[in-house]
Amino acid sequence: TPMNAIIGFTTLAVSNIDNQERVRDYLGKILSSSNHLLSLINDILDMSRIESGKIQLEETEVSLSDVLHDLKTIISGQIHAKQLELYMDAMDVTNEDVYCDKTRLNQVLLNLLSNAVKFTPAGGTVSVRLKQFPGIAKGSELYEIRVKDNGIGMSPEFVQKIFSPFERER
């Protein structure tokens, strides 16, 4: 979560206080994670609109490369703390710029990544793969972003409920 990233990078900054370059890097990551946390808080405040079906997506031009880079920045503290390997790659991507709601995309991907990190044992791997497919119409592509880990996984019973609101495997 962004709060874990903020705490992790703050701890790293304090332990490297004499290394100005590292501290500056950690502060940039803290700022990025703080902005994401603010975005999540705003999303929580919008929950009543989501439940009533009145939420509006804010589609803007977004660089998928930037999205993946930002995610890597946010999650890298947790990856390092658990001694995990993080792999990110793109396959067959010829157009990185898409129109989407960047906040919602980041929210979904960060939740998936945070869960992957949380449930992957030390020394494990987490990967993110972006793949582009041809769309039905010319100039319209389809994208798949897959988050994969070698963590504990989900029980078959829980998989049937993953899209129910506020569900969590016990």
Residue ranges and their predicted role:
Residues 14-21:
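Short acidic helix/loop segment immediately C-terminal to the autophosphorylated histidine
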Residues 32-37:
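Short alpha-helical segment of the dimerization/phosphotransfer core of two-component systems
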Residues 64, 153-161:
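Short helix N-cap motif at coil->helix boundaries in the Bergerat
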Residues 69-81:
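Short alpha-helical segment within the cytosolic histidine kinase core of two-component systems
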Residues 77, 152-153:
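Glycine-rich G1-box
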Residues 116-117:
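Short helix-loop "hinge" at the ATP-lid/N-box region of the Bergerat-fold HATPase_c
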